């Protein structure tokens, strides 16, 4: 059977590395046929983390990181293809998100910035590469995010019940798939970003594996209440956010004396904050019938978060996308393969009901091989 393969590449706000997957669009629905992961080199991760947290850099430093990311993507792709016995000629196009370093959709001059030189990706892989997906949506009045709900709609929508796909990366975003209604999707809260930053600060670990550290802590009710009292949660959808809001500086401002608490108690409270802030939004959506919550992203591997979702959402069936045929770690990468397919065929790929754009458009800039 003829194959129609597109490669999706994603590196998210967690800075852990690069997700890659191949989708076969000869299938309906498209099928994930291969997936892989390349860890972020420590020196590049350190420089990116500093850039995201300090918000200050030089043009030279920004340009150098842009180049280094481009090389990382290209080398990751070549190694991935070799491991899966694929050649460049097997792949129709690459859809590469790039690395978000700033996302500010609501200012006087709205903009979003993803870096990683895609000229290098196209040149080094010999494959047409498509990137810069967000700015076209912003150019027609949208938030530039989230872009994945259109893909979720095609894969997970049901005519029988409300389905919400919750992606927990650095930030938590949802796709709301309601029968006979336009799909909507938006960022709802922080995801892993605060928990990751806090354990990195105190234990020099990238993340709290299996919530082991958080489980040793006790909830701090006053801190939790302060965190939940965030104006972002009162904004109407569609809306988007990022590390420029939810960071350790924000956390410090939410507490009169953060150092008075045991670090593990803060970690437990951050986990509860992530769970409750997401649940508060989901409860505004639930119907009388049982609803389905499909969780993907790194947060789906956090047993404490999954436990709290089940406890706090009695009307919902809580599952991971693994149980519905799509690996939890590669949903976003798969979405960018889909976005590349849409761009190659000049098909629209944003949903105005999701991003707030004035019109549907085909997203992405093409970098020929």
Swiss-Prot record:
Q: Which CDD domains match?
A: ASKHA_NBD_ANMK
List ligand-binding residues for ATP: 12-19
The family database entries (PANTHER family) matched by this protein are listed as: ANHYDRO-N-ACETYLMURAMIC ACID KINASE (PTHR30605:SF0)
Full protein name? Anhydro-N-acetylmuramic acid kinase
Give the enzyme's EC designation.
2.7.1.170
Q: According to its UniProt record, which protein family does this protein belong to?
A: Belongs to the anhydro-N-acetylmuramic acid kinase family.
A GO BP entry: 1,6-anhydro-N-acetyl-beta-muramic acid catabolic process
Cystine connections: none
Q: Name one GO molecular function term.
A: ATP binding
Q: What class of enzyme is it?
A: transferase
Which pathway does the UniProt entry assign to this protein?
Answer: Amino-sugar metabolism; 1,6-anhydro-N-acetylmuramate degradation; Cell wall biogenesis; peptidoglycan recycling
Can you name the source organism?
Actinobacillus pleuropneumoniae serotype 7 (strain AP76)
Q: Which HAMAP family match?
A: AnhMurNAc_kinase
Q: Which ranges does the record mark as transmembrane?
A: none
Sorted alphabetically, which InterPro entries does this protein's record hold?
A: Anhydro_N_Ac-Mur_kinase, ATPase_NBD
- Task of the protein: Catalyzes the specific phosphorylation of 1,6-anhydro-N-acetylmuramic acid (anhMurNAc) with the simultaneous cleavage of the 1,6-anhydro ring, generating MurNAc-6-P. Is required for the utilization of anhMurNAc either imported from the medium or derived from its own cell wall murein, and thus plays a role in cell wall recycling.
> Keywords assigned by UniProt?
ATP-binding, Carbohydrate metabolism, Kinase, Nucleotide-binding, Transferase
Catalytic function, reaction form: 1,6-anhydro-N-acetyl-beta-muramate + ATP + H2O = N-acetyl-D-muramate 6-phosphate + ADP + H(+)
Q: Is Nucleotide-binding one of the keywords UniProt gives this record?
A: yes
Which Pfam family, any one of them, does this sequence belong to? AnmK
């Amino acid at each position: 059977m003829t194959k129609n393969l597109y490669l999706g590449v994603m590196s998210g706000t967690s800075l852990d590395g690069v997700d890659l997957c191949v989708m076969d669009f000869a299938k309906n629905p498209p099928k994930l046929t291969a997936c892989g992961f390349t860890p972020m080199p420590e020196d590049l991760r350190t420089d990116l983390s500093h850039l995201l947290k300090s918000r200050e850099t030089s043009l030279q430093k920004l340009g150098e990181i842009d180049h280094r990311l481009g090389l990382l993507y290209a080398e990751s792709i070549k190694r991935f293809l070799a491991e899966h016995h694929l050649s460049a000629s097997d792949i129709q196009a690459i859809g590469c998100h790039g690395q978000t370093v700033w996302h500010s959709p609501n200012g006087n001059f709205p903009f979003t910035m993803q870096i990683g030189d895609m000229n290098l990706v196209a040149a080094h892989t010999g494959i047409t590469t498509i990137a810069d997906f967000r700015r076209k949506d912003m150019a027609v009045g949208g938030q530039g995010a989230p872009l994945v709900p259109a893909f979720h709609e095609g894969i997970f929508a049901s005519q029988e019940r409300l389905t919400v796909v919750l992606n927990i990366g650095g930030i938590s975003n949802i796709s709301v798939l309601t029968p006979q209604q336009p799909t909507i999707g938006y960022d709802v809260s922080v995801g892993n970003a605060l928990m990751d930053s806090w354990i990195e600060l105190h234990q020099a670990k990238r993340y709290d594996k299996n919530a082991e550290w958080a489980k040793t802590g006790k909830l701090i009710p006053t801190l939790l209440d302060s965190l939940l009292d965030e104006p972002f949660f009162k904004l109407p959808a569609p809306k988007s956010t990022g590390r420029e809001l939810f960071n350790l500086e924000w956390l410090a401002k939410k507490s009169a004396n953060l150092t008075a608490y045991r670090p593990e108690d803060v970690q437990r409270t951050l986990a509860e904050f992530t769970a409750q802030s997401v649940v508060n939004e989901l409860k505004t959506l639930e119907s009388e019938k049982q609803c389905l919550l499909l969780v993907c992203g790194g947060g789906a591997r956090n047993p404490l978060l999954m436990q709290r979702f089940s406890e706090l959402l009695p009307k919902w069936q809580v599952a991971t996308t693994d149980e519905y045929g799509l690996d939890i770690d590669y949903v976003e990468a798969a979405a960018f393969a889909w976005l590349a397919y849409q761009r190659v065929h000049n098909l629209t790929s944003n949903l105005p009901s999701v991003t707030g754009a004035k019109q549907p458009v085909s997203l992405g800039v093409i970098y020929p091989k």
